[in-house]
């Protein structure tokens, strides 16, 4: 049986670094909620069986009317960290008929520049892979190491062979669930899914990402994201 595709959007964070009273995934950019762009990209990929959005149990900002016409489901089961929210979302996917052998693509709600084309490139590249992988970009900037709490450069780090992880991150549902459970048992709270897969001894692949697919994190990122989203993805 051909493995099915599911998308999982952890959306339980508060976005404290964004400088906004409203969680960043609900901020309006180019006329729509930031989260809308992620949901629309996956909605355009009809090959997905379901897109599941994981909210915090006490989220009072989510308004389904802002996402009318898009195909997705919501579960208010988010945890205290990304890792916890993803794990709970993976368990909820079983309700939609997902099996351990099916694929899940986990994507940050705060990466509104994702496109259907990039999603499909990731799937096409990894659909026959035994592990899975992520979209990422080679590090372009010179890297400096600065001690915690300081402002003096300790040394310059080589950027050779370094990649900056993005999302979506695509893995088998069963493999990812067990990898996260193992990390939890060993006291680790990892910041992305590939880290859990690596921790379990597997080797994820990287697929070329896009500068457009950056993560909105700081206050100044909103203006850049709005400028990008106001233009078609294929605009020069």
UniProtKB/Swiss-Prot annotation:
Keywords: Isoprene biosynthesis, Nucleotidyltransferase, Transferase. Transmembrane segments: none annotated. It comes from the Bacteria. The keyword Endoplasmic reticulum does not apply. Pathway: Isoprenoid biosynthesis; isopentenyl diphosphate biosynthesis via DXP pathway; isopentenyl diphosphate from 1-deoxy-D-xylulose 5-phosphate: step 2/6. One of its GO terms (biological process) is isopentenyl diphosphate biosynthetic process, methylerythritol 4-phosphate pathway. It catalyses: 2-C-methyl-D-erythritol 4-phosphate + CTP + H(+) = 4-CDP-2-C-methyl-D-erythritol + diphosphate. The record marks 17, 24 as: Transition state stabilizer. GO terms for molecular function: 2-C-methyl-D-erythritol 4-phosphate cytidylyltransferase activity. It is an enzyme of class 2 (transferase). The keyword Acetylation does not apply. Belongs to the IspD/TarI cytidylyltransferase family. IspD subfamily. This is 2-C-methyl-D-erythritol 4-phosphate cytidylyltransferase. It comes from Burkholderia cenocepacia (strain HI2424). The lineage of its organism: Bacteria, Pseudomonadati, Pseudomonadota, Betaproteobacteria, Burkholderiales. The gene is ispD.
